[in-house]
Amino acid sequence: MMKMMRNKPTNLPTAGMTNGGRGSGGGGGGGGRESGGRDLEIRPGGMLVQKRNPDLDPVGPPPPPMIRVRIKYGAVYHEINISPQASFGELKKMLTGPTGIHHQDQKLMYKDKERDSKAFLDVSGVKDKSKMVLIEDPLSQEKRFLEMRKIAKTEKASKAISDISLEVDRLGGRVSAFEMVTKKGGKIAEKDLVTVIELLMNELIKLDAIVAEGDVKLQRKMQVKRVQNYVETLDALKVKNSMANGQQKQSSTAQRLAPIQEHNNEERQEQKPIQSLMDMPIQYKEKKQEIEEEPRNSGEGPFVLDSSAKWETFDHHPVTPLSSTTAKNNAIPPRFNWEFFD
C-alpha cells in the first residue's frame, strides 16, 4: 500500500498527458496539479482527491438584513437595530441600557399582546419599522427582589457554615491530639477538655441559628453531626480521665493510711480482752489525787497568826505514817468469786 501511495503521484503527469494532451515536461512543471490548476491531496484511505479551500467554501446562507424597531417607553421612543431572527429576550436586554429597567422587569407589547421573552421576532411578525410598547412590570420586579434576597441569604448562610467548618476542623485536631495522649497512657487536664467542649457547643449554637434550604441545609446538618461526635468523644475522654484520677487518689490515700492501720493493729494485739466486769480493777487514783491536791489553807489571802486568839488543846494521838495510808489506798482489793442467782 505504501508503495502504491508513493507511486501514484509519479504517475500523475502521465494521466495529465492523456487527459489534457500535454507532454511529460508540462506534467513535471505542474508539480502534481490537474489541468484545472487545483491542488490534489491523498486521503488516509489512499484516495486522491481535490484539495479543499476553506476560504472559498460557503459557510451557509447569508444572514438576513437588520431591521429597525421603535419601542415606546412612557413618552420617549427608542429605536433599536436588531436581527429579525433574534428573540424578544435579546431585545429586552438591549433596552436595559437606554431605559434603565432590568430585562426581567420589562413587558414588551406588540400588537396589543404581551410577547414572551423566548419568542422570536420574525415568527411573531415583527418587521422593519415595527412599533412596540415597553411597560415596567412591578410583580416581576418584586419577584426579582425576593429572589435576590434569597440568593444573598443563601450565600451568607453558606459563608457562615464555611467559617464554622474551619473552626470545627481546628477543634477536631485538638480532639484527635487528646485521643492520642489518652491512648499512650497520658493524662489530660480537665480544664482543657472543658474548654474545648464549650467551644464546640458555641459552634453548635451558631449552626442552630442558621436557617437554610437545599444544599446549604445539608451542609449545616453535616456540621452539626460532626460537632456532636466531637462532644461525645470529649465526654468519654473526660470520664476516663476522672476515673484515672479517682484511682490515683485512692491509691495515695491507701498508702497514707497503711502505717496508721498497722499501728492500730499492733495496739489491738497488745490489749487483752476483758471477759467480765469482775476482772476490771478498781482505781483509787482519783481519790488520792483529791486528797493530795487539797490545800491546807482553804481561805483566800496569806495566812496571818493572831497572837490574841485563844487556842484549845487536844489530847495527843499517835500520827499514822503517810506511807502506810498510801499503801492501803493503792492496794488492790482482793478478787472474789461471786455467785449470781436468777
UniProtKB/Swiss-Prot annotation:
Phosphoserine (modified residue): where? S298
Q: Name one GO biological process term.
A: cytoplasm protein quality control by the ubiquitin-proteasome system
Key words, A-Z: Chaperone, Phosphoprotein
Q: Where is the BAG domain?
A: 160-238
Composition bias of kind Polar residues appears in 8-17
Domain Ubiquitin-like, residue spans: 65-141
What GO molecular-function term can you cite, just one? Answer: protein-folding chaperone binding
- What name does UniProt use for this protein? BAG family molecular chaperone regulator 1
* Protein's gene: BAG1
